[in-house]
């Protein structure tokens, strides 16, 4: 599984994303520039320039027409992918930590930071696809403020039909909101309860690729969790030995990929084994760790799995994107119980 190394960012990666077809990779970093790459060979297609601060998040709509970026420069920008033109810029009161399109492309959520005396929010914008895409509303159609009894929201995403917004919080809780009214529905603690770690901030939420009926979370408490979207029930816990920054679910195979590592200031040497800078593969059902992939020389900040399940991309603190395509041994791997079940099914047929 030889990786393709994508070099184009001058500073640490903050997020990587595939489009729905999987032929493009979108990446953002602390260098204020977004990049678009061909996933087949790692060639850079172009850049999106206009931010003046760290870009924390990027998302692309389901039709690869528009993408959105959220930045520390207090703006959200909407881009026309074909030309690289910025068609809209929204000013926000605080840095924007996460952006995500709804499944039907009609809305965009943005998580803003709780700093400078401002309350953190989840803001929802209606997206207009008419004409040249520049006729966007200047204000959000919905603002969900952080509840007085809750810690700030760090990440958020949409349920399968866009009816709900699932948010991860600084204290390890996940919450569920009605995406039309902003009504709070329920919350549950999923991190900060599995070990003695005091810091339990949720760093990533990604949805199941097949039906979005459950999410995988990553947290600074050195764990990742599988959580049911309908009930917020904790389904599985994957325990690691370093803070986790990102987690993703693979289609085809029942695996979860985790990424993270010790922060640079806490690592006494630059060896990747010391900092635990590997992508970790766990069996989704049996929760066993089944392998690691090395390569980065700093924590992994973002992992995205190819929509077809044929590979994954990781963005690191070292400023590199590593694109891996799985070989035959990956697809052939089975636990004994899986092999036995398959044999029984074949004999019954």
Swiss-Prot record:
Keywords: Cytoplasm, Initiation factor, Protein biosynthesis, Repeat, WD repeat. Its main location: cytoplasm. SUPFAM superfamilies: WD40 repeat-like (SSF50978). SMART domains: WD40. It is found in: Cytoplasm. GO terms for biological process: formation of cytoplasmic translation initiation complex. GO terms for cellular component: eukaryotic 43S preinitiation complex; eukaryotic 48S preinitiation complex; eukaryotic translation initiation factor 3 complex, eIF3e; eukaryotic translation initiation factor 3 complex, eIF3m; nuclear periphery. WD repeats lie at residues 8-49, 51-91, 93-135, 148-187, 197-239, 295-336. GO terms for molecular function: RNA binding; translation initiation factor activity. InterPro entries: eIF3i, WD40/YVTN_repeat-like_dom_sf, WD40_repeat_dom_sf, WD40_rpt. Component of the eukaryotic translation initiation factor 3 (eIF-3) complex, which is involved in protein synthesis of a specialized repertoire of mRNAs and, together with other initiation factors, stimulates binding of mRNA and methionyl-tRNAi to the 40S ribosome. The eIF-3 complex specifically targets and initiates translation of a subset of mRNAs involved in cell proliferation. Belongs to the eIF-3 subunit I family. This is Eukaryotic translation initiation factor 3 subunit I. It comes from Debaryomyces hansenii (strain ATCC 36239 / CBS 767 / BCRC 21394 / JCM 1990 / NBRC 0083 / IGC 2968).
């Amino acid at each position: 599984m030889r990786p393709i190394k994508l070099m184009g960012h001058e500073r640490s990666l903050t997020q990587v994303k595939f489009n729905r077809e999987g032929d493009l990779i979108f990446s953002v970093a602390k260098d204020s520039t977004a990049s678009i790459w061909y996933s087949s060979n790692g060639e850079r297609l172009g850049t999106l320039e206009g931010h003046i601060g760290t870009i924390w998040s990027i998302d692309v709509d389901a039709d690869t027409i528009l993408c959105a970026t959220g930045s520390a420069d207090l703006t959200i920008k909407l881009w026309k992918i074909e030309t690289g033109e910025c068609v809209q810029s929204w000013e926000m009161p605080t840095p924007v930590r996460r952006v995500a399109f709804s499944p039907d492309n009609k809305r965009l959520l943005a998580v803003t930071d709780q700093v400078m005396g401002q309350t953190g929010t989840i803001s929802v914008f209606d997206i207009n696809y008419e004409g040249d895409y520049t006729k966007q509303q200047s204000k959000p159609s919905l603002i969900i403020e952080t509840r007085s009894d809750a810690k700030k929201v760090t990440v958020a995403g949409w349920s399968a039909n866009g009816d709900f917004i699932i948010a991860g919080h600084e204290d390890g809780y996940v919450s569920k909101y009605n995406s039309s009214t902003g009504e709070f529905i329920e919350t549950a603690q999923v991190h900060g309860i599995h070990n003695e770690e005091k810091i339990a901030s949720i760093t990533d939420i990604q949805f199941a690729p097949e039906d979005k009926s459950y999410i995988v979370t990553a947290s600074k408490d050195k764990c990742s969790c599988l959580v049911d979207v309908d009930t917020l029930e904790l389904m599985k816990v994957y325990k690691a030995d370093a803070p986790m920054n990102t987690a993703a679910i693979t289609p085809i195979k029942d695996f979860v990929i985790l990424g993270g590592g010790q922060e640079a200031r806490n690592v006494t040497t630059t060896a990747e084994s010391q900092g635990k800078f590997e992508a970790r593969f766990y069996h989704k059902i049996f929760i066993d760790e089944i392998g690691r992939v090395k390569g980065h020389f700093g924590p992994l900040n973002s992992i995205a799995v190819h929509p077809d399940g044929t590979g994954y991309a990781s963005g690191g603190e070292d400023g590199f994107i590593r694109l891996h395509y799985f070989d035959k041994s990956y697809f052939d791997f089975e636990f004994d119980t899986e092999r036995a079940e398959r044999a029984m099914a074949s004999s019954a047929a």
